[in-house]
């Protein structure tokens, strides 16, 4: 509880510092002026992303050749995992969803949730590393290229542990078969997020999809820094910095990130919270 309150306090502190330099009224007005059809489009894309993430969770569980839970249990554990993300920084609270699904071993369950998190983090880092070539022109090209190559090869490197660790050898074939699928799905998921930002940002000022992807890939990198609730506050400060030179004042940048946070993170928690409440009553 104290740990959760600490990260909640940090998120609120960062937001307070941000709103000291930004007109909160402007942000609220911008949020209210987002067209309904844009909100519905962003919500529809969120549903597509959630389906893709569900597929990834299913692939992750099936790394284990002896996994045999039914689809209902897989979907229930996935939905419950969405609100659990808020319990720990970096979304690591979602690891607790392994307690809501049957598996042949604890090792297989841990490997499933770890491989899912690996795919999610890998895609975010890959996009951020690729964007760095344009967003940070002053950085060493060799250093940026090295970082990009290491990140790109990271799943292959980690796959080597399935050969050397005795408890993971049974997962080797599943890793080779499913990890490529999971990585492709996560790349698509990141592109869908960029599309959502593109739609939201263009309600305030014109920006191309390519420019959106370059800048918001760096902003999304903040989600991997495990110090706040689902990146809240940290993401807004990144957005203010990296969108300013694209013509977005602080209030407009925050409008886009807060709108997507509410649609993509808060609204999607509702089914999982309902399942948790029902389970607690039972």
For every predicted segment, state its role.
Residues 91, 105-108, 252:
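Conserved short cytoplasmic inter-helical helices of the MFS fold
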Residues 1-79, 131-227, 234, 242, ...:
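Predominantly cytoplasmic-facing regulatory/coupling regions of multi-pass membrane proteins
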Residues 90, 102, 240-242, 281:
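N-terminal low-complexity, intrinsically disordered patches enriched in charged
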